Amino acid sequence: MRVALRVAYDGSRYHGFQYQPDVPTIEGALRKALSELGLELVGYASRTDAGAHARYQVVVVEGDPELAQPDPINARLPKDIRVIAKTEVHEEFDPRRDALRKEYRYFLGPLNRPEAAARAARKLEGKHDFSAFRREDGRNPIITVERCELVEITPNAYVLRVVAPRFLWEMVRRIAGFVWEVGHGLREEGDAEALLSGKFEPSKKPRCLPAEGLILWHIEYDEVRFERTKAWFEDHKVIQLGGRLLLRLPEGAESC
């Protein structure tokens, strides 16, 4: 049996999840910690962008299951990366392909027109061509967004929830950019129809908001249940990600 680990991290100091030589990455830190215990990382659920965060990343490791425990791994990790739960999985389990759906959240801060922004978000639900909401990567742009909703978390501070079976490169950040633009009167909510038609002017694509406001919030699997551990409670602050994200506009949103 392999072991799946649920990992939370504050990505502020890292150049994304995927390993890169000579720069700090989440995968690099995990591989180093795991190797000291004779464990090997063999798969992960999502390749988050530089600066993005996660409260529900899933990685799969091979090696002695008795050593694949949160406490010894966390003792070898930086404090802004925590293994908070584990479970045993079958040998064929693929944390990316076996995911039923993922939820991302983007912290938008205050909005001048929250009602219009909320309606704009809802227009993106359903099966659409999301070519206008991605950086080109050759993948099929037809995606069914199961939920896209604006939630007020404190007075005039908003978070965008987006749930789908899969996502395109920069998709959530551009969806957030569209909702943010509507929320500040820079675009009309009715623009959604043209953007989702697949026939749009490239210059009209929504802005891509900075990754620092983005959190991989949840991943749903069939029959995979994680055991919460002591690390869940002691290091829960890592996945709260800070009031610094909630009440201000993400850096660079005005100019990107």
Curated annotation (Swiss-Prot):
List the Pfam families. PseudoU_synth_1
InterPro entries in UniProt: PsdUridine_synth_cat_dom_sf (IPR020103), PsdUridine_synth_TruA (IPR001406), PsdUridine_synth_TruA_a/b_dom (IPR020097), PsdUridine_synth_TruA_C (IPR020095)
Q: List the disulfide bonds.
A: none
Tell me where on the tree of life, at the top rank, the source sits: Archaea
Molecular function terms from GO: RNA binding; tRNA pseudouridine(38-40) synthase activity
The answer to whether UniProt assigns keyword Plastid to this entry is: no
According to its UniProt entry, the function of this protein is described as: Formation of pseudouridine at positions 38, 39 and 40 in the anticodon stem and loop of transfer RNAs.
What protein does this entry describe? tRNA pseudouridine synthase A
Q: Give the source species.
A: Methanopyrus kandleri (strain AV19 / DSM 6324 / JCM 9639 / NBRC 100938)
Q: Which gene encodes it?
A: truA
